[in-house]
Amino acid sequence: MISSSANVPRSGFYYFSQGWKLVSQPGIRRFVILPLLVNILLMGGAFWWLFTQLDTWIPALMSYVPEWLQWLSYILWPLAVISVLLIFGYFFSTLANWIAAPFNGLLAEQLEARLTGATPPDTGIFGIMKDLPRIMKREWQKLAWYLPRAIVLLILYFIPGVGQTVAPVLWFLFSAWMLAIQYCDYPFDNHKVPFKEMRMALRTRKVTNMQFGALTSLFTMIPVLNLFIMPVAVCGATAMWVDCYRDKHALWK
């Protein structure tokens, strides 16, 4: 059994840093390989293509800046770049999580077992196949919750002035919360905790989850490091589950 943090709740920054340590633990590494490969292939290809398009996209986005804000262009330009990286990174992170969802759930389950010494249900390829419909239904629930809110925020980008100042900040906060939901959901879902109940549980420690999601969002924008972020975030979120939520919500002890 690995000791995570003596079951004392810590900050979201702590759990994110724990993810980097836990991902390389003996016995856990083999469950990291498939999520890691999915993320490397998808995020690596996506960000390579993105950087070939930035010279076209950023001027197009800046064209929405009204003349009376042109004097702020030296501030708005980096905000525009960050906005594109945030939106693009979150979109492809979501896609990668869809593809790797069954393996992320297995990684969270095996790590939880090692952190707690508890015995998980029988797993393996047949267990994953049996749970696949439930896992994909859960991913649809997350998408249905996320999409309407994301569309509203994206519309803000096309409002002159607002789109280049307020919208990037709102999108960062939203993506931080959504990434906390995305990764914390794997251990919650392993214990069949309903999606709405999971969101309510996360709100009881909103600052911790926003810290965790904000760091995950930032690292998703950083080339090379973003290739490893999926399994790291799953491990960090699982450590948070063990310390903060498991006692109340665990299905298996």
Curated annotation (Swiss-Prot):
The keyword Zinc does not apply. It is a multi-pass membrane protein. It is found in: Cell inner membrane. Pfam families: EI24 (PF07264). GO terms for biological process: cysteine biosynthetic process; sulfate assimilation. Its main location: membrane. The chain crosses the membrane at residues 31-51, 72-92, 151-171, 222-242. The lineage of its organism: Bacteria, Pseudomonadati, Pseudomonadota, Gammaproteobacteria, Enterobacterales. Belongs to the CysZ family. This is Sulfate transporter CysZ. InterPro entries: CysZ_sulfate_transptr, Sulfate_CysZ.
